[in-house]
Design a protein with these regions (language model features):
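Non-catalytic interaction/Regulatory regions outside core domains
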Residues: 19-168
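Bacterial Sec-dependent N-terminal signal peptides
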Residues: 1-25
Length: 168
């Protein structure tokens, strides 16, 4: 069983990204950069405000999650989570990788977006693995931090410090 897990993790680490320069920091945390034209794509399509870091909370594919993360569509708990963090200079959005469920989400939420042109799925290969969520933070230079799976307040603060050039 241990060998199967090790093989899965090795394959997962090779498949987590496509079209981005990426380094693996730990089992589920990645850092890297995307080119300027991809930053421009994000600003154009996801209401990324000038002078801010973009925080993206992903709800991944139903097929990659052992539970239905779309059962609860309301994200009030997530809004409260970010409000308590009191982060400055951030644009916070949510991406649904399930297009057929997106219509339900966008009726009540203006900060939910589709994965336009499969940008995130193709660039970061979020179809791989068995996870329900992913968290990404990107600065305007294109440097990013990505955590696949569950995340904590500490992850968000660490990502923010790293992208500002500080040590967490």
């Amino acid at each position: 069983m241990k060998n199967i897990v090790v093989i899965f993790l090795v394959l997962f680490s090779f498949s987590i990204v496509g079209h981005a320069q990426v380094d693996r920091r730990s089992e589920f945390v990645f850092e890297g950069s995307i080119p300027e034209h991809k930053v421009a794509f994000l600003k154009q399509n996801y209401n990324w405000k000038e002078g801010t870091k973009l925080i993206i909370t992903f709800k991944t594919f139903l097929s990659t999650c052992p539970r239905n993360q779309y059962r609860v569509i309301d994200n009030d708990w997530n809004d409260e989570f970010y409000r308590k963090l009191a982060l400055k200079n951030v644009t916070n959005i949510y991406i649904s990788l399930e297009d057929n469920l997106l219509r339900k989400l966008t009726k009540s939420r203006k900060d939910f977006y589709e994965d336009k042109d499969d940008f995130f799925t193709k660039t970061f290969n979020l179809k791989s693995g068995r996870h329900c969520y992913a968290l990404m933070m990107i600065n305007e230079k294109g440097s990013f931090m990505l955590r696949v799976g569950e995340y904590t307040e500490a992850d968000i603060f660490d990502f923010s410090k790293i992208l500002e050039g500080e040590q967490p």
